[in-house]
C-alpha cells in the first residue's frame, strides 16, 4: 500500500503568496475601490470583507504577440464554408455597447469585464485605515495605550514563501544531508579503498571486484536519493507584533440628535463614528471612548444607546461641550491623558448659543485637548456655528473642521482628519 503525506505549508491556502503580491502591486486601485464601496454599505456592515473591482486595463501586463502586419496562411479545423481569399463578414448584432455588464463597450463586439475578487475583513480594515493615526499623541506619565509594531523575531519552521530565508534553509539542508549520509559515505570510502587494493592485486579477483562495484553503486544510489532540500529544512523569517506603549488616550464622540437632524443626516454621522470606532479599536489598545448625545440637553451614554437611541429634541450645542468639560475635569487629567474629540452636527443651533460654544472651546476645551475635530453634515449654507468655529480654526492648531455634503464625502473627510503626521504639532 502506498501512503502520501502532504507536507505543504500552504496546502489549504496555496495562492497566499500570489495574493499578497497582487495586493501590493495594485494597492492604489484597491484602495480606490474600497473608498467607493464603503459608501454603499449599511451602517452595521462597515467592517466585513468586500468584493473589489479593478478595471481590466489597470491589471494588463506586457506580452509578446504577432504584429498586425505581414502575410499569413492559416488552416482552421472544421472549416467547410470558406476557401482561401474569402472575406468573412463581421457578425451582426450583439456588438459593443449592447451588453448589460460593467465591461467597456467595443466597436468589434469584444470586450472584458472588470476584474472582481474578494478581500478578507482583516485585509479590508488594514487598507481602510492605512497611514492613519491620532494626531499629536504625547508620551505622558502613565502608559496604558498600546500600539503594535512589527519586528523581526528570528526564524520559524512555518510561514509563507515570500518570507523564506534561503541561507538558513540551505544551512539546514546541508546539516541534514551530512547527518543522513555520513555513515554511508564512510562505508563507501572503505569499499572504494578495498576495490582499489583488489584491482591492483595479483591474481585478479573478478568476483570480489564485481561484488564491491555492486555495493558501491548501491551506496551511491542511496546517497543520491537523499533529497537536496526538504520541507524540514525550510526556515522563514519570523515577524511578530510587539506592543509599543504610548500614552493613554480618550476620545469624546459628540453627536447632535436634535430634530433638525433628519434620518439620512444621522446615518451619515453614525457612519463617521463607526469608522472612528473601528480605527481606534484596530490601531490602539485600551483607548477609552466617551459617547455624548445632545439636543437641548446632553447625556453621556453607552455605545448601543449612542448609535440606536431614538431620542430627539431642540438644539443647544453648548450643552454637549459643557458636559465634556465636566467629564474631563472629573475623570481625565490632561497631564496624564491625551484627550481627543470628534463633534458631528448639521450646524443648526440656537443663534445665541453659538458664541457660547466658541467661548467654551476657546477657554476650556481646546487648551487641554490634543485634537478637536468638527464635522458639519449639511447641504445648506453654513450658519452661525460654522462661522464661530472658523475663528477657532485660525487661532488653534489643534482644531480642525470639515464639511460633509453627502455619503461620498465621509471616508475622504475621515482620512483628511486623521492622516498620519510626520511631526507632532503640539508638545
From Swiss-Prot:
Q: Where is the composition biased (Basic and acidic residues)?
A: 79-90
Question: What switches on its expression?
Answer: Expression is probably regulated by NtrC, which binds to the promoter region of the yeaGH operon during nitrogen starvation. Expressed in nitrogen-starved cells shortly after sensing nitrogen starvation. It appears to be continuously expressed for up to 24 hours into nitrogen starvation.
Give the span(s) annotated as Disordered. Answer: 79-110
User: Keywords, A to Z?
Assistant: Stress response
What this protein is reported to do is described as: May play a role in the adaptation to sustained nitrogen starvation.
User: What single Pfam family name could you report for this chain, choosing any that match?
Assistant: DUF444
Source organism of the structure: Escherichia coli (strain K12)
InterPro entries, alphabetized: UPF0229
Which PANTHER family does the entry mention?
A: UPF0229 PROTEIN YEAH
Q: Which NCBIfam families match?
A: PRK05325.1-2, PRK05325.1-3
Name it.
Answer: UPF0229 protein YeaH
Q: So what family is this one in? A: Belongs to the UPF0229 family.
- The gene coding this protein: yeaH
Compositionally skewed regions (Gly residues) per UniProt? 92-102
Amino acid at each position: 500500500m502506498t501512503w502520501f503525506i502532504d507536507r505543504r505549508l500552504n496546502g489549504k491556502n496555496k495562492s497566499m503568496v500570489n495574493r499578497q503580491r497582487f495586493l501590493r502591486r495594485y494597492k492604489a486601485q484597491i484602495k480606490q475601490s474600497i473608498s467607493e464601496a464603503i459608501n454603499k454599505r449599511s451602517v452595521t456592515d462597515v467592517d466585513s470583507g468586500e468584493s473589489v473591482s479593478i478595471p481590466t486595463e489597470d491589471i494588463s501586463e506586457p506580452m509578446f504577440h504577432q504584429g498586425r502586419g505581414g502575410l499569413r496562411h492559416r488552416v482552421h479545423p472544421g472549416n467547410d464554408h470558406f476557401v482561401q481569399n474569402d472575406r468573412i463578414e463581421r457578425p451582426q448584432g450583439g456588438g459593443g455597447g449592447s451588453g448589460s455588464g460593467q465591461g467597456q463597450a467595443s466597436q468589434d463586439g469584444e470586450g472584458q469585464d472588470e476584474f472582481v475578487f474578494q478581500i478578507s475583513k482583516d485585509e479590508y480594515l488594514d487598507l481602510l485605515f492605512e497611514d492613519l493615526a491620532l494626531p499629536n499623541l504625547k508620551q505622558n506619565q502613565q502608559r496604558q495605550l498600546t500600539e503594535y509594531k512589527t519586528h523581526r523575531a528570528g526564524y520559524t519552521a512555518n510561514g509563507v514563501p515570500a518570507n523564506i530565508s534561503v541561507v538558513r534553509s540551505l544551512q539546514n539542508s546541508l546539516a541534514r544531508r551530512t547527518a543522513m549520509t555520513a555513515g554511508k559515505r564512510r562505508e563507501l570510502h572503505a569499499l572504494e579503498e578495498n576495490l582499489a587494493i583488489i584491482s591492483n592485486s595479483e591474481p585478479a579477483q573478478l568476483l570480489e571486484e564485481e561484488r564491491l562495484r555492486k555495493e558501491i553503486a548501491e551506496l551511491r544510489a542511496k546517497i543520491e536519493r537523499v533529497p537536496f532540500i526538504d520541507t524540514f529544512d525550510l526556515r522563514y523569517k519570523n515577524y511578530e507584533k510587539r506592543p509599543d506603549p504610548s500614552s493613554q488616550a480618550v476620545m469624546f464622540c459628540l453627536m447632535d440628535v436634535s430634530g433638525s437632524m433628519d434620518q439620512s443626516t444621522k446615518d451619515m454621522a453614525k457612519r463617521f463614528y463607526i469608522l472612528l470606532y473601528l480605527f481606534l479599536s484596530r490601531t490602539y489598545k485600551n483607548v477609552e471612548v466617551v459617547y455624548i448625545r445632545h439636543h437641548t440637553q446632553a447625556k453621556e451614554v453607552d455605545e448601543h444607546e449612542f448609535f440606536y437611541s431614538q431620542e430627539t429634541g431642540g438644539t443647544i450645542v453648548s450643552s454637549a461641550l459643557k458636559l465634556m468639560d465636566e467629564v474631563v475635569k472629573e475623570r481625565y487629567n490632561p497631564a496624564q491623558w491625551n484627550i481627543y474629540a470628534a463633534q458631528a452636527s448639521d450646524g443648526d443651533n440656537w443663534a445665541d448659543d453659538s458664541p457660547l460654544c466658541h467661548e467654551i472651546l476657546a477657554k476650556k476645551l481646546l487648551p487641554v485637548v490634543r485634537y478637536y475635530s468638527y464635522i458639519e453634515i449639511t447641504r445648506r449654507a453654513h450658519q452661525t456655528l460654522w462661522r464661530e468655529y472658523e475663528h477657532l480654526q485660525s487661532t488653534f492648531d489643534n482644531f480642525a473642521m470639515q464639511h460633509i455634503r453627502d455619503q461620498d464625502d465621509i471616508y475622504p473627510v475621515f482620512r483628511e482628519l486623521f492622516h498620519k503626521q510626520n511631526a507632532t504639532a503640539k508638545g
